[in-house]
Swiss-Prot record:
It catalyses: di-trans,octa-cis-undecaprenyl diphospho-N-acetyl-alpha-D-muramoyl-L-alanyl-D-glutamyl-meso-2,6-diaminopimeloyl-D-alanyl-D-alanine + UDP-N-acetyl-alpha-D-glucosamine = di-trans,octa-cis-undecaprenyl diphospho-[N-acetyl-alpha-D-glucosaminyl-(1->4)]-N-acetyl-alpha-D-muramoyl-L-alanyl-D-glutamyl-meso-2,6-diaminopimeloyl-D-alanyl-D-alanine + UDP + H(+). The keyword Cell cycle applies. Its main location: membrane. The gene is murG. Pathway: Cell wall biogenesis; peptidoglycan biosynthesis. Belongs to the glycosyltransferase 28 family. MurG subfamily. This is UDP-N-acetylglucosamine--N-acetylmuramyl-(pentapeptide) pyrophosphoryl-undecaprenol N-acetylglucosamine transferase. One of its GO terms (molecular function) is undecaprenyldiphospho-muramoylpentapeptide beta-N-acetylglucosaminyltransferase activity. InterPro entries: GlcNAc_MurG, Glyco_trans_28_C, GlycoTrans_28_N. It is a peripheral membrane protein. One of its GO terms (biological process) is cell wall organization. It is an enzyme of class 2 (transferase). CDD domains: GT28_MurG (cd03785).
Amino acid sequence: MKKIILVAGGTGGHFFPAVALGEELIKRGYEVHFITDLRCQKYINQNMGLIFHILDLKRSDNIFLFLPNLSIAILKAIKLLYNIRSSVIIGFGGYPVIAPMFAAIFLRVPIIIYEQNSYLGKVNKFFASFAKKIAISYEDVKNLPEFVKSKIVVTGGIVRENIRNVCHSRESGNDIKRSKDNIFTVFIFGGSQGAKLFSELIPASIQILMQKQPNLKLNIIQQAALDDQVKIKDIYSKLNINYEFAEFFDNMALKYKEADLVISRAGASTIEELTYIGLPAIFIPLPSAADNHQYYNAKLLADKKAGWCLEQNSISAEELADKILDLINNPKILEDTSQNLLKRRKEGHVLLSDLIERVI
């Protein structure tokens, strides 16, 4: 049985697409090893069928501390890769892949890089010259060196199976899931970074929106820290709207199914999932994201009329309220946006698996 190594860590945004790829490769008869870091250990479920290995590279801004840490991590990675003896290694970018990629170069294990954002990250750019192939989610990824363009294969985004199943239940894209009572549901998430935007500006927008259209039947599903939930609940209760809060939704597939519109950050995994199921969103990119990649992700969809991009540093509560109201009152816009999203959908887990099989 041939062995394949996947390397992803740091955040769930890297981890879960790699898991989805691993599950597809297992179905094809491969033994799949998954190298991740301590931050993603909490996501590990042994029922996934993957063989997990924890390899942590301690971060440091001090070069004299970082280099010894990197050296130790590379030596550990070399030992691990030597023992596994895989046919290929696939890196998902970010800090956690550095040591395994160096180990793969040393042991001459073929490398495939997967870039899920619309802007090639620093780590992926560094290892691009060593890669056999570079799989990308978007046709027009920025920051690609000219000399690697012959290695590029567009595979699209990789989406978890439970999220993919939502698409089948929504039938014709967005399907504008309003109940018999004509309730419009907005799903708001991604507030763990820059939470002030989600705990203050968005509730203020909802207040303005309800003042402008007081008879509107609105349902809000919102991710919010416990400390913020009390004050947001107070606002929504006075507005007489339905609401549901959680610090973290572990049933994202169900929430997607309930929603008519999403308001979120513009991380690659979020965009890939919404694209796959055709669920329209207002994106507010995280300004501090590496290489400003969230802005490029959201802008790309906005340019294709497949979403809306509002920048955190310039957006006002009034502007956001007007945008939400415009979409609520013009369902055709949501339907068209949904179809534009679905036009971009690819079976990334299948296409990247096909690419891996061609390399090995």
